[in-house]
Amino acid sequence: MLKLMLTASVSAAVMLASCTEGDLPASPTPPATEDTPVQVELKLKSEQMDTRAIDEDAINDINIYFFGNNINYHFYYPEYAPSFVFEILPGTYTLCVVTNVHKDMGGMTESELIRYKYSVDGMVDDIPMTASMNVSILGAMTLPTLEVTRAAAKIAYTISVDAAVSENIKLRSVQFCNVPRSTVLFGANPSSTDKGEYYDADVVNIDNDKTYSEVFYMLENCQGEVESITDPRDKSPENAPVCATYMRIVAEGADKVLEYTVYLGENSTSNFDVRRNTKHTMNLVIKGENEIDNRVRVYDGLYYGTANCIVYIDTPVTFDVTPYRTSKELNYAYTGIYAGDEY
């Protein structure tokens, strides 16, 4: 997990004791007043994961907003640095941080930032991340650690054909459908139900006709609950929300084309949510023309739970929900990322 560490001081910024840098000598300064700017230092603690198409742990640029009662501040840093120092007047602020949008977002009000939409076209080499909290800048002080969370979900999937049917069924392609084109970066607004706000990702042709593994990143798409779905076998295109995200897997059978549809979501029946900063690990085994064994794990930093799951057809599987944030005990993609004592 990435953490932003902010330090406010009236004098020159002081390195935190937990950092490897030594403390700078303190210098006497007059007490801060509402008309006296104070220096605020921002520190970012992260370790890079192994190189991949999208580096989900990278911080490449930062927009910082302080929204106060009488004054707002905006700071833009086009490149990562060990720390950033800026001056603001003492007061109570809502602090908002946005990373990896690759542009100066400019000054805006808090309501404008909440309504701001990020386009998926910008998610090429990294993932946008955000954080916010209320802070009181009184003078020389250390602000609480600020955790930055990803504005996208990670779908890690493996598709394979069971050995018993591999002579007759050959994998050909996979495609993610109903993928959001944009998302708000703050708040919990419901996802759009307008089909024009979604697209079908490129078809990925599969060379190995028996197994295929890959990772797909997508913006949040929470299509909510369909309470009328009480049987997992009814989690199908006929009953799913029109904009719910799903995987379309195409294979060749004996003189026929086979298509398997797998909906994403957070339970075995009624839920069709793919939330930001979650990791879904999907192990899909095709066992016949009308049968696909689907094991889905959803990782999220907010909760844990388990349930039985059947996706679209009759095969029962396991559906686990465990923390997404990397911990000392669980490192799913990279090691050494600081996750805090709670994990």
What are these regions (language model features)?
Residues 325-343:
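Surface-exposed binding patches on compact interaction domains or structured appendages
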Residues 20-23:
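Bacterial signal peptide processing site
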Residues 38-46, 155-161:
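A short, amphipathic beta-strand motif
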Residues 1-5:
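Positively charged n-region of N-terminal signal peptides that target proteins for export
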Residues 49-112, 158, 162-276, 321:
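Tryptophan-paired
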Residues 114-162, 267-312:
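Extracellular beta-sheet/turn segments enriched in Thr/Pro/Gly and aliphatic residues
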Residues 15-18:
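C-terminal motif of bacterial Sec signal peptides marking the signal peptidase cleavage site
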Residues 303-304, 310, 317-325:
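C-terminal functional modules
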